[in-house]
Amino acid sequence: MEKVVIVDAVRTPMGRSKGGAFRQVRAEDLSAHLMRSLLSRNAALDAREIDDIYWGCVQQTLEQGFNVARNAALLAEIPMNVPATTVNRLCGSSMQALHDAARTIMVGDADVCLIGGVEHMGHVPMNHGVDFHPGLSRTIAKAAGMMGLTAEMLGRMHNISREMQDQFAARSHQRAHHATQSGAFRHEIIPTAGHDADGALQRFDYDEVIRPDTTVDSLAALKPAFDPVNGTVTAGSSSALSDGAAAMLIMSESRAASLGLPVRARIRAMAVVGCDPSIMGYGPVPATKLALKRAGLSLSDIGLFELNEAFAAQTLPCIKDLGLLEQIDEKVNLNGGAIALGHPLGCSGARISTTLINLMESRDVQFGVATMCIGLGQGIATVFERV
């Protein structure tokens, strides 16, 4: 079976969804920009040799509809012989795109793939056109489709206090701000055209949604967002609404060697699992354990973890049950997470994987895990190995 390697991994800045930098930039353009950038950064690859493009996106309608992957590829002027498909596993869509492409390479049906994902939550809100089947209430809790309430449930089950959530949320912003100030994000962000507050066109090379002035005290003043009477989850301890895209160039190890392209990481193992929709945020725990079992590794072998921070009340139980609470500041989300950067749904899997690979390089770590919860009760995880 072919070994699959990551040759390059990039992302756009994360733009604020409400009146932010990308308010006049379409999802296809964010995607096409990254596709072009990956090809220009890896000039040894002839674009005609790309076997397929896998692109994650959740709300596949309006500008994100009609196979946004193919639309973006055509905008990027990738040769027309290169096919493209759009993938949807809700929050895990672009990580699923990575898994789908990797398996294609593993079995020899492809050598080179572009993968990634996009979500413009300012143009296509996450609840746009959603119409759950009324019969679902006979098999799952009605609130299982309300992500904030599932976070409340998970937090209560694991005794996650409001103060713990606020501390974790403040940490996310502080670490993301430090990563910005220290230049750590420069290795993954591709400067992207957008508009400033006055409408002037400019290139953005920083994440717009980070709030450097966030403190535990300022978060403590916020009201519960989903359960106004007994809730602990607030807007401040939830992932921000943002617009963005992320992308990776992956190929067989043998093709990377023949092209003379540097290998940044190898995919060691992958997993996806289901769990109770009422606690959908717990999915990273069984997904990580299954991926590690397939990799022949243990939790102690992993030097870095990236967990998508859908909610602090959701992330902390996962960190606890993975035995990482005592190592959180050495191993978990060292550059912050979605609470600070936002969670553009279809983008996030490739985004956290890109951040993880950059951290693995900067800290000389051999093994890393990127893992995410998924709405309606799923989890997805990828084990990366530096080579």
Curated annotation (Swiss-Prot):
One of its GO terms (molecular function) is acetyl-CoA C-acyltransferase activity. It holds the Pfam family Thiolase_C. Pathway: Lipid metabolism; fatty acid beta-oxidation. It is an enzyme of class 2 (transferase). One of its GO terms (cellular component) is cytoplasm. The lineage of its organism: Bacteria, Pseudomonadati, Pseudomonadota, Gammaproteobacteria, Enterobacterales. The keyword Lipid metabolism applies. PANTHER family: 3-KETOACYL-COA THIOLASE FADA (PTHR43853:SF11), 3-KETOACYL-COA THIOLASE, PEROXISOMAL (PTHR43853). It comes from Pectobacterium carotovorum subsp. carotovorum (strain PC1). This is 3-ketoacyl-CoA thiolase.
